[in-house]
Design a protein with these regions (language model features):
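Bacterial N-terminal signal peptides that target proteins for export
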Residues: 2-14
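Glyoxalase I/VOC metalloenzyme domain signal
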Residues: 27-38, 43-63, 80-311
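Bacterial N-terminal signal peptides
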Residues: 11-24
Length: 311
């Protein structure tokens, strides 16, 4: 997916234009592989105050973000230095979730529910995915009213047939400046974590899911390994998604049975693993694809698997 950037106007000389035309086949070949830009991940719950308290107790105080334009949900945000963020979503009125694509998740206390990737050419990306044979729902406008009264607006497009951002990510394009939507939260300024690095996506059939992502984004074969607590993993180097398929039952199998294929864990980036481990009292250190991974106390996070990855 193309990186968001400011438009740049320029003039091309005839020679430059000719060179571009001559190299177009090579450029087209290279563009077949799409790099995703992770925008944000979502955690749903039945009560926003409860969600905020859970993450505050874990050492990352969320900022209240305001109600969404659908009149059904509201959110809080943990914004990181790299402009990615964790979104906490809950109904405005307790138990009233009709009209939200994540209604079934908001019946729970706290559960990972979606992931999104960003673009500044949403319609182009929708067209590309359709040509690749990926089902895409018509783009929709969305908005949120911040506590200061400012309206934040965007466009989204959902992929596949599940809930938004369940297996393939939903796509989001800002219609207002991005820094209206996310800024680094005071609760993580100067913290040893800098953003959301990976989404761990629970899947039933690893081979089928690998094929789906390769079809959508033109990626090469992933690296695979097995982790006792998750099952068999597949990682596409340089991309933000790790696929996880269970074996011999376990919590991941149970979760897939209840919610289907959705995110099951999120990993935050760090350049100082020791400092992150100390600050957040991480545990269960393992090595995933050559990187250290350790976890927040899942009990304190009411079952949410949130980890840190790095060196």
């Amino acid at each position: 997916m193309p990186k968001r950037s400011s438009p740049i106007c320029c003039r091309l000389s005839f020679a430059t234009l000719l060179l571009l035309l001559m190299t177009q086949p090579a450029m087209t070949q290279e563009s077949k592989s799409v790099t995703l830009e992770l925008d944000h991940v979502s955690i749903c719950g039945s009560n926003l105050d409860t969600l905020r308290r859970i993450f505050t107790d874990a050492g990352m105080t969320p900022d209240y973000g305001g109600p969404h334009g659908n009149g059904v949900t509201q959110m809080a945000i943990i914004g990181f230095d790299d402009a990615s963020y964790v979104e906490l979503i809950a109904p405005i009125k307790p138990g009233v979730t009709a009209g939200s694509g994540w209604a079934k998740f908001m019946a729970e206390d706290v559960v990972p529910c979606a992931w999104a990737v960003g673009t500044n050419v949403l319609l182009q990306e929708v067209d590309r995915l359709k040509k690749a044979g990926i089902p895409v729902k018509p783009p929709e406008r969305g908005s949120r009213k911040r506590p200061d009264g400012m309206s934040v607006e965007w466009m989204t497009a959902d992929l596949g047939s599940g809930t938004p951002g369940s297996t393939l990510p939903f796509i989001i394009e800002d219609q207002t400046p991005r820094d209206w939507r996310v800024q680094t939260s005071a609760g993580v300024k100067g913290a040893p974590v800098s953003g959301v690095e990976n989404v761990v996506l629970g899947v039933n059939n690893l081979d089928a899911s690998i094929a789906l992502f390769r079809k959508a984004y033109g990626w090469a074969e992933p690296i695979t390994e097995t982790q006792k607590d998750f099952g068999k993993l597949a990682y596409f180097p340089g991309e933000p998604v790790i696929l996880a398929a269970p074996f011999n039952g376990g919590w991941l199998s149970d979760r897939l049975g209840k919610f289907g294929e959705v995110p099951v864990a999120y990993l935050l980036a760090t350049r100082d693993f020791a400092a992150a481990t100390k600050k957040y009292k991480l545990n269960g250190m393992r090595t995933w694809f050559g990187q250290k991974v350790a976890w927040f106390d899942a009990g304190k996070l009411k079952g949410v698997r949130l980890g840190v990855i790095g060196q």
